[in-house]
Design a protein with these regions (language model features):
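C-terminal ends and interior cores of transmembrane alpha-helices
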Residues: 91-104, 309-326
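Cytoplasmic helix-loop-helix junction between adjacent transmembrane helices
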Residues: 112-149
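Cytosolic juxtamembrane N-terminal segment immediately preceding the first transmembrane helix
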Residues: 1-32
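Conserved MFS/SLC helix-loop-helix module at the cytosolic interface between two early adjacent transmembrane helices
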Residues: 68-104
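Extracytoplasmic gate region of multi-pass secondary transporters
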Residues: 37-38, 231-284, 383
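Cytoplasmic membrane-interface "Motif A"-like loop-to-helix N-cap segments
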Residues: 79-90, 296-308
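Helix-breaking motifs and short loop linkers at transmembrane-helix boundaries and internal kinks
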Residues: 49, 81, 102-108, 136, ...
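Glycine-rich segments within core transmembrane alpha-helices of 12-TM secondary carriers
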Residues: 141-166, 185, 372-383
């Protein structure tokens, strides 16, 4: 039995451009669909005559669906191809979002948003794996940072469209029109079908697999099981804890920071808006900076430095979160705490690249998709946990938000323990069966 290394063929500049543009748009649409819902919740509640708890549960169901979608489309990405899985995920995503606009009751909306979540969950992993398999290994970090940095575009678009739709149209139609904009992934599907190539590394691997000329760990079982077997078991457990800790901290702070500033610390709405705009700019620059640094110093560095910024944020939140706005942003402690938080967020820029480099090609799509979406699923619990903890401390929202501190420590610990992979080839390295030649 011999070991064969199958190198991915080169990609043209046009092909690489199509890949990164589609991934940036895909991630932006993914996050846009999640972030626009808070702007629509009030209108949906009144239009359908449902409770706030019910409309809030719709977002939770969407995130639960995304965990299932991550596993499903990750599996398909390893079996039918990265591009095909991405197209199928976008189709379900778009169909669910468009259909949601015509929901007539709580249950119809809940089911359709759950379906939307399944499609949404498959988009990120399939696109991110294809990107990393096609991109220059020396610049994967900065490329991944550009993709994740499109979150800034998503947040801005969600706020603009959400406010525009609910204020420009009737109560019955405003939220429906906003949800219809989620059908834009159909346009991205057409773009992908026309311009974006399939992963050449996967095509070569699949050709050998179909000929029976290659042996992989996933050949004897499904890819979701294979990622938890043998030497991948401890790695997968660490990756899950790593991603879950990140998402719990992210949602535990980002959901409540505007409320903390405005209602608890007496910051006027325009000051909260200005701080959010400044934070978005700093966050975008941080993504790009960390992307360049993790290409130079390693994936661990690209996650560790932002994680330490989060640690500073947690300590400062504990010490200074009681200091109210006194007329100056620069003398408002929560402003600097928020900047420390958004700098820490840039750890997400290394996630897709690090996970893609950690896992072998036969389980890569499944592992990357499932781990990311499982993390997001756990992160969705933070908006429930924070108020509960706040209640234990006399209703102090800031005290409730400090519940993210253990998650930060777990994130830092897993960052130190995970293997460094900078510069790793994502071509296939697998055992091939010997070929018998007739005499």
């Amino acid at each position: 039995m011999t070991t064969a290394t199958i190198d991915a063929a080169g990609y043209s500049t046009a092909e690489r451009t199509a890949i990164i543009v589609s991934c940036m748009l895909g991630f932006a649409l993914d996050l846009y669909d999640v972030l626009i819902m808070p702007f629509l919740m009030g209108s949906i509640q009144k239009s359908l005559g449902i409770s706030l708890a019910q409309v809030s549960s719709v977002t939770s169901l969407t995130l639960i669906g995304s965990v299932i979608g991550g596993a499903l489309f990750g599996y398909l990405g390893d079996h039918v191809g990265r591009k095909q899985a991405l197209q199928l995920a976008l189709l379900m995503f778009a169909a669910g979002s468009i259909a949601s606009a015509f929901a007539w009751s709580y249950w119809s909306l809940a089911i359709l948003r759950f379906v939307t979540g399944i499609g949404l969950g498959g988009e990120w992993g399939a696109g991110m794996v294809l990107f990393n398999e096609a991109w220059n290994k020396e610049r994967r970090g900065i490329g991944s940072a550009f993709i994740q940095g499109s979150a800034v575009l998503a947040a801005a678009s969600a706020s603009i469209v959400g406010v525009w739709a609910t204020t420009s149209y009737s109560l019955e139609w405003g939220w429906r029109i906003a949800l219809l904009t989620g059908g834009s992934p159909i346009l991205l599907m057409i773009f992908i079908r026309s311009f974006m190539p399939e992963s050449k590394a996967w095509q070569q691997f699949d050709a050998l697999r179909k000929r029976g000329a290659i042996e992989t760990a996933a050949a004897k079982t499904n890819t979701l099981v294979a990622m938890f077997r043998g030497p991948l078991l401890p790695i997968s457990i660490m990756c899950l804890f790593w991603m879950m800790a990140y998402m719990f901290c992210y949602y535990g702070i980002v959901v409540f920071m505007p409320t903390l500033m405005q209602r608890t610390l007496d910051a006027p709405p325009e000051i909260v808006r200005n701080i959010s705009v400044i934070a978005s700019v700093v966050g975008g620059l941080s993504y790009l900076t960390m992307g360049a640094l993790n290409d130079r110093f390693g994936r661990r560095f690209g996650a560790l430095l932002p994680g330490l910024s989060w640690a500073v944020m947690a300590v400062a939140l504990f010490l200074y979160s009681h200091e109210k706005y006194q007329g100056s942003i620069l003398h408002f402690p929560i402003f600097w705490i928020y900047l420390s938080f958004v700098i820490g967020n840039s750890a997400l820029g290394v996630v897709g690249t690090w996970l893609s480099e950690i896992y072998p090609i036969d389980v890569r799509s499944t592992a990357v998709s499932f781990i990311y979406m499982a993390g997001r699923g756990v992160g969705s619990l933070a908006p429930v946990v924070v108020p509960l903890v706040a209640g234990l401390f006399g209703g102090s929202l800031a005290a409730g938000m400090t519940v993210v501190a253990p998650a930060i420590l777990i994130f830092l610990l897993m960052t130190v323990l995970l293997p460094e992979t900078r510069g790793r080839e994502l071509a296939v390295s697998a055992k091939t069966r010997p070929q018998h030649v007739a005499a």
